[in-house]
Amino acid sequence: MLILVSPAKTLDFENPAATQSYSIPTLLGQSEQLIDVCRKLTPSDIASLMKVSDKIAGLNVARFSSWDSDFTPDNAKQAVFAFRGDVYTGLDADTLSEASLQKAQQQLRILSGLYGLLKPLDLMQAYRLEMGTRLSNARGTNLYQFWGDIITDEINQTTAAQGDEFIINLASNEYFKAVKHKQLTANLVTPVFKDKKNGQYKVISFFAKKARGMMVRYILDNNVESLDALIKFDSAGYYYSEAESTVTAPVFLREEQ
């Protein structure tokens, strides 16, 4: 199975990665085209476009300016160790064994506004370019139009080469919209995580993001290769609810924390 996750806004380029192994992003040529567009933006353009403070806008101008596609471990970092959001807290990649990291390299893909699709050990340089950004480019007025079929084709090529029967979608709606799901050749499964609050089970963003990362970790640690094995996910008190689930959307519940 192939797993899809979102990137994170929070980045860590200070601490060293937990491995020296690395790879280079497949779609780097596309990234260069986007960088060329972004380098023409002023700090005020970026503040308006990305709805960020002047300070963050200035930081991103500097990042776009210094971005260099000749990635090395000295000027870039492996994606799974560079991202530091709720999903990545749940995954806790720093404690993965080398064997699990290599398994992740095969099974896990990170959707990205700038890089399109990243393998965990792909080197990347710091950036902020969310998939929902309305960035005018040569192919349209936003990043969904820029990426078009490119990400979907890359996913299909990967699942075909690896013989993956399932795609486990653990990405946010914003990022998964970059995938043309009707064109996917493997079976799509989108797990749902609900926490009990005030007597009702509901999707709570913070908990759901962390649960997505924990499910990635569970798949890697337990060599999960089937849906029967996937629904045994029980990290942090979650349990499978057959009553609420469908084949394509297994639901996992957790009592009030």
From Swiss-Prot:
What protein name applies here?
Answer: UPF0246 protein swp_3736
Superkingdom to which the source organism belongs: Bacteria
Which HAMAP family does UniProt cross-reference here? UPF0246
Gene Ontology terms describing biological process = response to hydroperoxide
NCBIfam families from the UniProt entry: PRK02101.1-1, PRK02101.1-3
Spell out the family assignment given in the record's similarity comment. Belongs to the UPF0246 family.
The record's Gene Ontology cellular component field reads: cytosol
Task: Name the InterPro entries for this protein.
Answer: YaaA (IPR005583)
